[in-house]
Structures are given as structure tokens and as C-alpha cells.
A protein has these predicted regions:
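Terminal alpha-helical segments
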Residues: 1-140
Length: 140
């Protein structure tokens, strides 16, 4: 069932979209004819949208880019130390553009795909906690 849609500046909506991308990255592996590059793109998108949910929750302006390290740097600039698994998100940036086009890079391996999903899961989980924590702090 499709979740209800909210405003584009709602961090929960961004988190919902991140979770949707993560589901596709994990579940579509079972479909025949699906390229690992496309699944890795979904993993990258899950991480990107999750990070942007945190940025929105904290009222941090951000550019609409796919560079996950640049986005995470905005959070670190505010004094937040990032857990090591979240810092690994930068490895996903290449899946946002280059690997989606045939012949620009070697095909993605199964190991790269599995690592991408693990990283995306860590980022989405971390972002969910950050968004929830920020909600509680705002209520005080």
C-alpha cells in the first residue's frame, strides 16, 4: 500500500521515500532482467533522501546534488559527529550517475551491490533516529 504523501519540506516524507528506494534496492534483486547498477542507484537514492531528511529536520539549507559526502559535510559543519557506517555513504555517490550509463564503468559486482545495500540501510536507520530525536527536542 502506498503511504500518504506529505509536503516536500516534511522530513518524514523524505524518509518515507528513502525507505521506498531501499525496499526496491533490496527486493528487486529477485526480478529477472534487473541490473545491479539500477539497484545500487536505488541504494544511493535511499541514502541521499535519508540524509536530506536530516538536513530538513535541522533546517540546514542544501543543494540538490547527489554527492553524499558534500551533504554529510553540512551536518558535520553543525557539530554532529557521524557514525562510521554513515560516513561510508560517500561510496554510494558513484552509483548516482556514472554506473547507470552503459559502458562508462565496469559492471557492478554482486559484492559491490551487497555493500551498497548495507551502507544504505545504515544511513536510513541513522536518519530515522535523527529525525525522531529532533522531533522530541523541538517539543521541549
Amino acid at each position: 500500500m502506498t503511504p500518504a504523501r506529505k509536503a516536500g519540506n516534511d522530513p518524514q516524507e523524505w524518509l518515507n521515500r528513502a525507505k521506498s528506494n531501499l525496499v526496491r534496492a533490496k527486493e528487486d534483486i529477485r526480478l529477472s532482467g534487473v541490473f545491479l547498477e539500477d539497484l545500487c542507484f536505488d541504494a544511493q537514492q535511499a541514502a541521499e533522501k535519508a540524509i536530506k531528511a536530516v538536513l530538513i529536520r535541522r533546517n540546514i539549507q542544501f543543494p540538490y546534488v547527489h554527492d553524499l559526502m558534500a551533504l554529510l559535510a553540512l551536518i558535520e559543519k553543525e557539530g554532529e559527529s557521524l557514525p562510521e557506517p554513515v560516513k561510508q555513504a560517500g561510496r554510494l555517490t558513484r552509483f548516482a550517475v556514472v554506473t547507470r550509463y552503459p559502458g562508462l564503468e565496469e559492471p557492478v559486482t554482486r559484492e559491490e551491490y551487497e555493500r551498497a545495500v548495507i551502507i544504505a540501510e545504515a544511513v536510513v536507520q541513522w536518519a530515522g533516529k535523527q529525525v525522531k530525536k529532533s522531533k522530541r527536542q523541538k517539543r521541549r
